[in-house]
């Protein structure tokens, strides 16, 4: 039970937030502090169990290993920073702040479960727990754009969930097992003369599973929801979807495909080719469609699709050469680098848009002259997302490119490099508007100390992970070595 203490603490904190909300009539800012206190306790519980030997729990449904612990810390940290960035923004909700923070915590619980699951049934349940919380959070503004985004996300999410379930059912029908380890054992004990890649139902199950998970990470061609949902959602939730939800989807993606579908190699290379094609489409489409955007949240929505493509490059490297650790390490490092870079960008946008009243890129004209701190922070984030040294985004792309080359995917590395150049067009357009244009009016950006602290922490992380990444790389290497099934 001690090993599940972080999840228990998060669940109790969500309940306490809802109960406390009933007794607060004026300022509800304390709900954010209560949520942060619970997240701090969950983080401490995770660290205390960090060196515990890996084990399976609840009949092999959950893995308590280094991989799960790494994502626990990552998701808890990201959720804490999102809550800090929400303190000012949630004044728009007034009566529903308790529900807002509780749903953020429940989404966190679902994402932690996604990284820990080793069973097809709990995999689906954890996905839906996080998904249901996000469906509500997306529509929290209750205006036309927010409601439209929530409905679109709900309907397309339902279709994706149906495809995922169908895929998991086909995998179960082939193996007769729901536990990932048992499915792997079944595949390994098949007659030596049997070509598993010729089993149409099983391959279809893998394709449908990729489809369902592809929706969760906004990978092409399952990305249709992302730009509209990102634009219409409350900005902190756009941030949460962009970083934490995407990371959770890839955490599940890697555990499932690395632990089950990398043996035999022919099967591994089969799905790796599919992933490589999706990566190519995602990088190209996301970057090209981001160029003409005038709304910065929508632009970052297309950018997020492109970054999902970069992460799929690492996943393709895992599939093509599963014996190499570089693919797994580069995938996790990219998730962290993208998360902290996107955090800086969106936290800056929350502060700026609250003062200007607009998310349109032209409203950022001359921002460097009126608010140099926030302009510098947003510039830092955009440079990191582009892949400029010595920032975290540069090393992340370097590791991705290196993993692709070592996995004999040179063509995919070239595609990724070309797309990196294309992405500079729209990132530098925003930088140009902020630094080279004259301000339309004198607007001072005001923000609370929690938002400033979130901006400072994430900005510092972008610099530290780019200049001295050794500690993070060591944690990631240990986490990927301890994936059990």
Swiss-Prot record:
The keyword Methyltransferase does not apply. The chain crosses the membrane at residues 3-23, 30-50, 67-87, 96-116, 120-140, 154-174, 202-222, 247-267, 271-291, 299-319, 332-352, 375-395, 411-431, 453-473. Its main location: membrane. The keyword Transport applies. GO terms for cellular component: plasma membrane. It catalyses: a quinone + NADH + 5 H(+)(in) = a quinol + NAD(+) + 4 H(+)(out). InterPro entries: NADH-Q_OxRdtase_suN/2, ND/Mrp_TM. Keywords: Cell membrane, Membrane, NAD, Quinone, Translocase, Transmembrane, Transmembrane helix, Transport, Ubiquinone. Its EC number is 7.1.1.-. It is found in: Cell membrane. One of its GO terms (molecular function) is quinone binding. GO terms for biological process: ATP synthesis coupled electron transport. NDH-1 shuttles electrons from NADH, via FMN and iron-sulfur (Fe-S) centers, to quinones in the respiratory chain. The immediate electron acceptor for the enzyme in this species is believed to be ubiquinone. Couples the redox reaction to proton translocation (for every two electrons transferred, four hydrogen ions are translocated across the cytoplasmic membrane), and thus conserves the redox energy in a proton gradient. PANTHER family: NADH DEHYDROGENASE. NDH-1 is composed of 14 different subunits. Subunits NuoA, H, J, K, L, M, N constitute the membrane sector of the complex. Belongs to the complex I subunit 2 family. This is NADH-quinone oxidoreductase subunit N. It comes from Dehalococcoides mccartyi (strain ATCC BAA-2100 / JCM 16839 / KCTC 5957 / BAV1). The gene is nuoN.
């Amino acid at each position: 039970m001690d090993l599940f203490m972080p999840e228990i603490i998060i669940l109790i904190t969500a309940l306490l937030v809802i109960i406390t909300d009933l007794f607060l009539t004026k300022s509800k800012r304390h709900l954010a502090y209560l949520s942060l206190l619970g997240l701090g306790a969950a983080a401490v519980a995770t660290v205390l169990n960090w060196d515990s030997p890996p084990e399976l729990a609840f009949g092999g449904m959950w893995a308590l290993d280094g991989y799960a612990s790494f994502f626990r810390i990552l998701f808890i940290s990201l959720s804490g920073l999102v809550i800090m960035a929400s303190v000012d923004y949630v004044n728009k909700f007034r009566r529903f702040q308790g529900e807002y923070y509780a749903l953020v915590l429940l989404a966190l619980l679902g994402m932690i479960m996604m990284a820990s699951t080793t069973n097809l049934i709990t995999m689906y349940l954890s996905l839906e727990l996080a998904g249901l919380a996000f469906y509500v959070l997306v529509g929290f503004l209750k205006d036309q754009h927010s409601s439209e985004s929530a409905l679109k996300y709900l309907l397309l999410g339902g279709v994706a969930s149906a495809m995922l379930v169908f895929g998991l059912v086909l995998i179960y029908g082939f193996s007769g097992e729901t536990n990932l380890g048992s499915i792997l054992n079944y595949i390994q004990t098949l007659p030596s003369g049997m070509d598993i890649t010729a089993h149409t139902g099983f391959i279809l199950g893998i394709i449908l599973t990729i489809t369902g998970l592809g929706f969760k990470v906004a990978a092409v061609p399952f990305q249709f929801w992302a730009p509209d949902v990102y634009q219409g959602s409350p900005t902190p939730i756009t941030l949460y979807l962009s970083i934490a939800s995407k990371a959770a989807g890839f955490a599940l993606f890697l555990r499932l495909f690395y632990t089950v579908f990398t043996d035999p190699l022919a099967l591994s290379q089969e799905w790796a080719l599919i992933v490589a094609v999706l990566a190519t489409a995602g990088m190209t489409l996301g970057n090209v469609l981001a160029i003409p955007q005038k709304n910065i949240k929508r632009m970052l929505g297309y950018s997020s699709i492109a970054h999902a493509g970069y992460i799929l490059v690492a996943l393709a490297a895992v599939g093509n050469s599963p014996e190499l650790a570089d693919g797994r390490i580069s995938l996790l490092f990219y998730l962290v680098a993208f998360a902290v870079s996107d955090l800086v960008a969106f936290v800056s946008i929350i502060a700026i848009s609250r003062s200007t009243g607009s998310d349109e890129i032209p409203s950022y004209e001359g921002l460097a002259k009126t608010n140099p701190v926030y302009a510098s922070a947003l510039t830092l984030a955009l440079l990191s997302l582009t892949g400029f040294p010595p920032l975290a985004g540069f090393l992340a792309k370097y590791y991705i490119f290196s993993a692709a080359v070592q996995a004999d995917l040179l063509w995919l590395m070239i595609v990724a490099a070309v797309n990196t150049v294309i992405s500079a067009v729209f990132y530098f357009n925003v930088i140009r508007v902020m630094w080279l244009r004259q301000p339309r009016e004198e607007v001072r950006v005001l923000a609370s100390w929690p938002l400033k602290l979130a901006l400072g922490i994430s900005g510092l992380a972008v610099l530290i992970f780019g200049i001295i990444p050794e500690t993070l790389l060591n944690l990631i290497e240990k986490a990927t070595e301890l994936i059990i099934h």
